[in-house]
């Protein structure tokens, strides 16, 4: 980065001006600014633990996938930082048409409010995945491949899990048969790519499945599925109350599993312009009461650059109907 002085406030201001503009308008950011965001946020990620220990109150959000206008809607609903503390569960890039604006605003907020704004790694924060599903092409079209590699270096340093007040375990994908204790997560070294198997892979890729006991094969061709019994054993062993994860489209933006011992959050409404799903976020108050805020899909369906690739996307396992928004978990 040399002597480049990153003006985060100016960047945030430009990124937020999109609220009054037409959907999909690109934000003008110099290559030096974007590179500066990656390098500075990478430093902060490495200064903080790979397994975050956070305190409520905070708002948790699931997949965003480059749907920048919807990210702004989430902040309008929950409050723009620092009005609220946030934890995002990964998958910031790919599929939507504004991955750059999305990840740049999130990294800028991380730099501006490092102790109040937290980002976990999703399976799309990985070079082999976002090389294919849109982010590489967006970087190459608007900047260059070198900048995409700078993002890769940043993503390789993201934390992979969080525990809120010793009771709520958060990650992008789910549990792992290799996970016996939290110290195993703390021992994961960064920077690191996402391997094809093992603990880090599973935290970012696994899925719950009501039809499985124990561990099962995953239709994605990566990692595993896990049953209700696995969830219950994990929570009991670690004296936890809830697993909060993302990684799957759910119709109402959130969906419970295993007698409300696990919740899936998905925060990209009308995903890829093809699904008629809502986007959800979960507010955890200081007593650990959880409530859900829902973004309905917009009336106008934006055109998504990579929606055509959705046909090759692994299908989400069918699961039971979600609980009503009035339900709360203590």
Swiss-Prot record:
Entry-annotated residues carrying Phosphothreonine: 315-316
Gene3D superfamilies: 3.60.21.10
Catalytic reaction list: O-phospho-L-seryl-[protein] + H2O = L-seryl-[protein] + phosphate; O-phospho-L-threonyl-[protein] + H2O = L-threonyl-[protein] + phosphate
CDD domains recorded: MPP_PP1_PPKL
Keyword line: Cell adhesion, Hydrolase, Manganese, Metal-binding, Phosphoprotein, Protein phosphatase
Binding residues for Mn(2+) 1: 63, 65, 91
Ranges annotated as biased composition (Polar residues): 308-319
Cofactor(s) the protein needs: Mn(2+)
Comment on bound cofactor: Binds 2 manganese ions per subunit.
GO biological process, one term: negative regulation of JNK cascade
Active site feature: 124
Binding site for Mn(2+) 2: 91, 123, 172, 247
Superkingdom per UniProt: Eukaryota
EC id: 3.1.3.16
Keyword Cytoplasm in annotation: no
Gene Ontology molecular function: metal ion binding; myosin phosphatase activity; protein serine/threonine phosphatase activity
Pfam families cross-referenced by the UniProt entry: Metallophos, STPPase_N
A GO cellular component annotation in the UniProt record: nucleus
SMART domains assigned to the protein according to its UniProt record, in alphabetical order: PP2Ac
Family (UniProt): Belongs to the PPP phosphatase family. PP-1 subfamily.
Subunit structure, as described in the record: Interacts with Nop17l. Interacts with uri; uri inhibits flw phosphatase activity.
Function: Required for cell adhesion in non-muscle tissues and in maintenance of muscle attachment. Vital for larval development.
Designated name of the protein: Serine/threonine-protein phosphatase beta isoform
Gene name for this UniProt entry: flw
């Amino acid at each position: 980065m040399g002597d480049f002085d990153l003006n985060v406030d100016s960047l945030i201001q430009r990124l937020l001006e999109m609220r009054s503009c037409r959907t999909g308008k690109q934000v003008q950011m110099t290559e030096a600014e974007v590179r500066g965001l990656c390098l500075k946020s990478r430093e902060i990620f490495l200064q903080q633990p790979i397994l975050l220990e956070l305190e409520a109150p905070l708002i948790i959000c699931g997949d965003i996938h480059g749907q920048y206008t919807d990210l702004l809607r989430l902040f309008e609903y929950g409050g723009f930082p620092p009005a609220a503390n946030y934890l995002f569960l990964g998958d910031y890039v790919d599929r939507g048409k504004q991955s750059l604006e999305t990840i740049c605003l999130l990294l800028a907020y991380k730099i501006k409010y490092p102790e109040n704004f937290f980002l976990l790694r999703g399976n799309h924060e990985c070079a082999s995945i976002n090389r294919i599903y849109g982010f590489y092409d967006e970087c190459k079209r608007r900047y260059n491949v070198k900048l995409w590699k700078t993002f890769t270096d940043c993503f390789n340093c993201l934390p992979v899990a969080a525990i809120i007040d010793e009771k709520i375990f958060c990650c992008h994908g789910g549990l792992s048969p290799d996970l016996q204790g939290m110290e195993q997560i703390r021992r994961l070294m960064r920077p690191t790519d996402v391997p094809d198997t093992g603990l880090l892979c599973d935290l970012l890729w696994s899925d719950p499945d009501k039809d499985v006991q124990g561990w099962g094969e995953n239709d994605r061709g990566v990692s595993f599925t896990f049953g209700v019994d696995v969830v219950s054993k994990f929570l009991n062993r670690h004296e936890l109350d809830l697993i909060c994860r993302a990684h799957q489209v759910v119709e109402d933006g959130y969906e419970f599993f295993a007698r409300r011992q696990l919740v899936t959050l998905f925060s990209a409404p009308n995903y890829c312009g093809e699904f008629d799903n809502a986007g959800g976020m979960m507010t955890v108050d200081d007593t650990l009461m959880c409530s859900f805020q829902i973004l309905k899909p917009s009336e106008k369906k934006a055109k998504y650059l990579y929606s055509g690739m959705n046909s090759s996307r692994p299908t989400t396992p069918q699961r039971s109907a979600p609980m009503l928004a009035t339900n709360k978990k203590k």
